[in-house]
């Protein structure tokens, strides 16, 4: 049942800016917040704006009043294509008026509500524009937004993103940390919630961006629960799922996983995010690899990212044991569970697959080896068995560990898909082919030694990819 909104001013009311002798007629209500209402306003020439109206009698505390003045001071100085423009502010004895750029398509939360979830190519475009706006805010004017969410990302008539609502924003001086806990529950970074002693900075916006990406692709926020305390608990544990039915690309999973890191210093920079494959890809990565193989656009060389060094089916464990070049040992079980011992040998990452409401979802957990939960103790014993049996003194590299997204059984071995879109053909006859950079770089091995990527091996890889892609 809808609740009728009490309007601060009747539709049709004319607001006069006495200093500039400009009259604004209120045409309709666009939205409302805790202390403000936003109207479509039109001047005599026919130009339209969004007018944010704050009723002063509703502001009871000095702190809220100070935030209002701070919002106006910060927002009025901002000038960027991906930030909502504030043209003017003025006030009467009862109200404060902010004349803002009109975003005809509304906010991203409304778009998501209409569509359920968005396609990756559309999300990539929205995210790229948001990142460009954040680069301006963080690097050019030292402003941290602190309430980045779908409802504060607005769309103009051409569906370009504009960051708006700077009510919780702050200017960050060199090395400064803020300690005020603020934001919207689903989007708040863990250091804002739990790190008051150490404070927070620009990285809090990057965390919120990760939540936004996930929400646009999946349809619901990653830490969604019925009550706020449970949401905060999920954020603290960094406990979220990747629903299998959403069919997320490895690039999307990789970017989200990088951003949703509880350590703010380990999150990617905005510049790194802007160059990530998720924002630049134009076609399915397997199709691009296939095309590069078909047109001989692969260059042989050493792959400098993580990949599968060794794998073997372990019937006793009902899974595939594997070793990565980074030093990760893991088992990918037949029921889609994935248990990995990190290179430091101090902790494991556990991806658990289960069926909920007829759909398969994945849960990510991390545990110290001396505190393995009872429910995965047997799986961990299996991993220890695999390590004891097949640890043959492999040579590792100091590369960033990258987890396996998918394993596909092929006629002559396994096809591994890594989170960064590197793929590995591990053939039972001892040949292994590692394709990175969407097939532009290839390393071929026979046993553990480098080998030439000859036409026969190339042909085998092409045939397998043709089958995966359904090419004729």
Curated annotation (Swiss-Prot):
Residues 307-392 form the POLO box domain. InterPro entries: Kinase-like_dom_sf, POLO_box_dom, POLO_box_dom_sf, Prot_kinase_dom, Protein_kinase_ATP_BS, Ser/Thr_kinase_AS. Disulfide bonds: none annotated. Residues 24-279 form the Protein kinase domain. The keyword Transit peptide does not apply. ATP binds at residues 30-38, 52. It comes from the Eukaryota. Its main location: cytoplasm. It is found in: Cytoplasm, Cytoskeleton, Microtubule organizing center, Spindle pole body. The active site is at 147 (proton acceptor). SUPFAM superfamilies: Polo-box domain, Protein kinase-like (PK-like). PANTHER family: SERINE/THREONINE-PROTEIN KINASE PLK. This is Probable cell cycle serine/threonine-protein kinase CDC5 homolog. It comes from Encephalitozoon cuniculi (strain GB-M1). The gene is CDC5.
């Amino acid at each position: 049942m809808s609740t009728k909104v009490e309007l601060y001013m009747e539709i049709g009311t004319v607001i006069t800016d006495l200093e500039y002798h400009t009259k604004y007629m209120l045409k309709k209500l666009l939205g409302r917040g805790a202390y403000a209402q936003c109207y479509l306003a039109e001047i005599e020439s026919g130009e339209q704006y969004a007018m944010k109206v704050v009723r002063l009698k509703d502001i009871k505390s000095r702190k809220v009043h100070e935030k209002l003045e701070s919002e106006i001071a910060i927002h009025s100085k901002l000038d960027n294509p991906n930030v909502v423009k504030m043209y003017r502010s003025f006030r009467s004895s009862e109200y404060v008026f902010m004349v803002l750029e009109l975003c005809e398509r509304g906010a991203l939360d409304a778009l998501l509500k209409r569509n359920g979830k968005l396609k990756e190519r559309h999300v990539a475009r929205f995210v790229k524009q948001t990142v460009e706006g954040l680069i301006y805010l963080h690097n050019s004017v030292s402003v941290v937004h602190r309430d980045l969410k779908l409802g504060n990302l607005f769309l103009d008539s051409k569906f370009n993103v504009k960051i708006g609502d700077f009510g919780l924003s702050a200017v960050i001086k060199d090395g400064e940390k803020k300690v005020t806990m603020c934001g919207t529950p689903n989007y708040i970074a863990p250091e804002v919630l739990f790190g008051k002693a150490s404070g927070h900075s620009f990285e809090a916006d990057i965390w919120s961006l990760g939540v936004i990406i996930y929400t646009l692709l999946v349809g619901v926020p990653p830490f969604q629960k019925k009550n706020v305390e449970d949401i905060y608990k999920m954020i603290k544990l960094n406990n979220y799922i990747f629903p299998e039915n959403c069919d997320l690309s490895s690039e999307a999973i990789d970017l989200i996983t990088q951003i949703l890191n509880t350590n703010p210093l380990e999150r990617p920079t905005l510049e790194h995010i802007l160059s990530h494959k998720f924002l630049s890809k134009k076609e399915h990565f397997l199709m691009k690899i296939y095309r590069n193989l078909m047109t001989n656009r692969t260059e042989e060389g050493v792959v400098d990212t993580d990949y599968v060094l060794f794998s073997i089916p372990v019937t006793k464990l009902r899974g595939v044991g594997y070793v990565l070049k980074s030093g990760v040992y893991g088992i990918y079980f037949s029921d889609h569970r994935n248990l990995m011992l990190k290179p430091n040998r101090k902790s494991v990452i556990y991806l658990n697959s289960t069926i909920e409401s007829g759909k398969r979802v994945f849960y990510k957990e991390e545990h110290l080896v001396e505190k393995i939960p009872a429910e995965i103790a047997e799986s961990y014993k299996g991993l220890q068995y695999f390590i004891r049996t097949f640890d043959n003194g492999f040579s590792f590299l100091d590369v960033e560990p990258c987890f396996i997204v998918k394993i596909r059984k092929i006629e002559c071995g396994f096809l591994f898909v890594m989170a960064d879109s590197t793929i590995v053909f591990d053939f039972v006859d001892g040949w292994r082919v590692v394709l990175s950079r969407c097939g532009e770089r290839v390393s071929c091995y026979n046993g553990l030694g480098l080998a030439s990527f000859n036409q026969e091996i190339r042909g085998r890889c092409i045939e397998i990819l043709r089958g995966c892609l359904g090419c004729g």
